[in-house]
Structure formats: structure tokens, C-alpha cells
Swiss-Prot record:
Gamma chains make up the fetal hemoglobin F, in combination with alpha chains. Coiled coil: none annotated. The gene is HBG. Residues 3-147 form the Globin domain. One of its GO terms (cellular component) is blood microparticle. Heterotetramer of two alpha chains and two gamma chains in fetal hemoglobin (Hb F). Belongs to the globin family. This is Hemoglobin subunit gamma. Pfam families: Globin. It comes from the Eukaryota. The lineage of its organism: Eukaryota, Metazoa, Chordata, Craniata, Vertebrata. PANTHER family: HEMOGLOBIN FAMILY MEMBER, HEMOGLOBIN SUBUNIT EPSILON. InterPro entries: Globin, Globin-like_sf, Globin/Proto, Hemoglobin_b, Hemoglobin_oxygen_transport.
Length: 147
């Protein structure tokens, strides 16, 4: 279980209030699919994923990215129980979708990069560290059913 300090919780909550869930979610998922093309196999119903521009402009990628970041928003409201928050999604991704749990870590890292790009100098090392801790905790919670 990940333990967040009061300062880390405040940093994450403050940053999250400024995140554009739709835009950043779509960009993060799109970048994941471009940079790690083997992850595309989990999205075969999304239509054209043949190029970076097709992926980044794909409405299904954008919609699912928004859904992913909305789930992360729920986790931020429940930072003390990430495992419980993601129990159902962990089961779904493990038992039904058979997603490699390493992909959760990859997406988290891509999300941190997207946030750093969007926030620029405002994205301090302290903010990055708190975000990395958060996405690592979420990745671990999502991988829980695999163990």
C-alpha cells in the first residue's frame, strides 16, 4: 500500500484541479499507443491506429483516455485506498481483458510526461515526485488481481 504524506496529497489534489481530463487523457493514451505500439492490440475495436496522426486524432482513443483519467480522479479522492478503488478495474483488466500489468506503469509514466509538458515550469520536481508516486500506486493497485 502506498502512503501519501499530507504535502503529497495537497500537491496532487491541487494539480488535479487544473488538469484537463479530456485533453490530457486522450493525449496520454494516444502517446502510449504510439510509443509502445504493442499496446494497440488491446484496442482493436478503436478503428484506425495505423499512424501517430491517426491515433492522436482517433475519437475512441480520446474518449477512452478521458475515461482513464476520470478513474484516476476517483483515485485522487481515495488516495488512502487505491487498492479498493481499483479492485473492480483490476479484476476486469486481469480476468477479462488480459492486459499486461506493465502497461499500467507505462501509461502512468506517459501521463506524467504529458502533465509536465502541459504545466511547464509550474511542474516542479516536487510535483513530479508526487505524481510519479501516485501513478506507481495506481499501477500497483491495478495489478493487484494478477498476484
Amino acid at each position: 500500500m502506498v502512503h501519501f504524506t499530507a504535502e503529497e496529497k495537497a500537491i496532487i489534489t491541487s494539480l488535479w484541479g487544473k488538469v484537463n481530463v479530456e485533453e490530457d487523457g486522450g493525449e496520454a493514451l494516444g502517446r502510449l499507443l504510439v510509443v509502445y505500439p504493442w499496446t494497440q492490440r488491446f484496442f482493436d475495436t478503436f478503428g484506425n491506429l495505423s499512424s501517430a496522426s491517426a491515433i492522436m486524432g482517433n475519437p475512441k482513443v480520446k474518449a477512452h483516455g478521458k475515461k482513464v483519467l476520470s478513474s484516476l480522479g476517483e483515485a485522487i479522492k481515495n488516495m488512502d485506498d487505491l487498492k479498493g478503488t481499483f479492485s473492480h478495474l483490476s479484476e476486469l483488466h486481469c480476468d477479462r481483458l488480459h492486459v499486461d500489468p506493465e502497461n499500467f506503469r507505462l501509461l502512468g509514466n506517459v501521463l506524467v510526461i504529458v502533465l509536465a509538458k502541459h504545466f511547464g515550469k509550474e511542474f516542479t520536481p516536487q510535483i513530479q515526485a508526487a505524481c510519479q508516486k501516485m501513478v506507481a500506486g495506481v499501477a500497483t493497485a491495478l495489478a493487484h488481481k494478477y498476484h
